Amino acid sequence: MPSSISNSKAGLQAGATTRSICLVLIGVALMGAMVEGLARFALDRMSRIEHRIEQEYRGSLTIPAKTTSGQPTMVLLGNSILLEGVDFPSFRSMMSSKYDVYRLVIEQTEYLDLYYILRTLFRRGSRPHDVVLCLGVDHLVGDNIRGEFTARYQDATDLADLVRREHLDATTTTNYFFAHWSGWFGTRTEIRKWLLARVMPDVGGLTTVLGFRPAPALSESEVRLKSEARLRELKTLCDEYGARLTIVIPPTLSKEDHAEVVSALGRELGIRVLIPVKAGTMEESLFRDGFHLNSSGAEVFTAKLASVL
């Protein structure tokens, strides 16, 4: 009889333990769902930048080759140099008789991020008539990637290709794939930035200046070697989906930006490379921080870009 009572108590204790474990797991799952919900739906409402990127990305997923009225479409693709250097509403108005213009700007990106995002857009059905990639030479040949943030804008196939291409380690690879599938994981850094900006409102300007440093000087031969491979793969991608590729090189303060090297390569490869403003010819007063144009500089560059496109 005591043995039966003992077994009964043990069974009750085991049941209570199982229920406790289940409650903990349910709590963890609910917490995870709440965090995902915050990341997926709240961040783009809290952050003006996140909201803009989400809106532009969604709009870029469904670009037709032509509008219902037969007008060709164009997508401008780039980073903060494009964002601040081209007055988009004015540019769109200037181009309205020729193109229906879209834009996708993701700050702190360089060639690799934008190339794989473009691949994803094409694969998901976007068919712009013209693709205009606006990147400085240093960003065209640069190897920096934004990683976790941009992973959510790339297909898993493209992300795997990027991992192999850059020989990323196992930890980084795991983080990127978590970021691809998890809204919270992909935006956790941005959430921290947003919170920091709320506490220290002036930190945005400081981080822009500190985080946007000139790339190490490259020789003409290095620029040519790297640019040629990248221009070729861009052209192959755009040709596959029937889009015309244009590279736009934005203005710089330095006269030695090797823009003419890229332009010459474009002519050799049959790619339109535009330099609306020659390097080193815009006054320093038209730049906000030595890299990005201010509103006056953007007004000048926007008009020049529209005239050559």
Give the label of every model feature segment:
Residues P2, L135, N144-G242:
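Secreted/periplasmic serine-hydrolase-like ester/acetyl group-modifying domain
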Residues Q108-L112, V223-L225, P250-H258:
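Acidic-and-aromatic substrate-binding clefts and catalytic sites of carbohydrate-active enzymes
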Residues M1-T18:
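N-terminal Lys/Arg-rich, disordered targeting/topogenic segments
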Residues V105, I249, I275-V277:
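Residue-level recognition of beta-strand->loop/alpha-helix junctions
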Residues E260-L309:
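C-terminal regions of proteins
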Residues R19-R40:
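Hydrophobic membrane-insertion alpha-helices, especially the h-region
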Residues G70, L77, I81-R165:
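Membrane-embedded segments
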Residues E50-T68:
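Short extracytoplasmic/periplasmic juxtamembrane "stem" segments immediately C-terminal to an N-terminal membrane anchor
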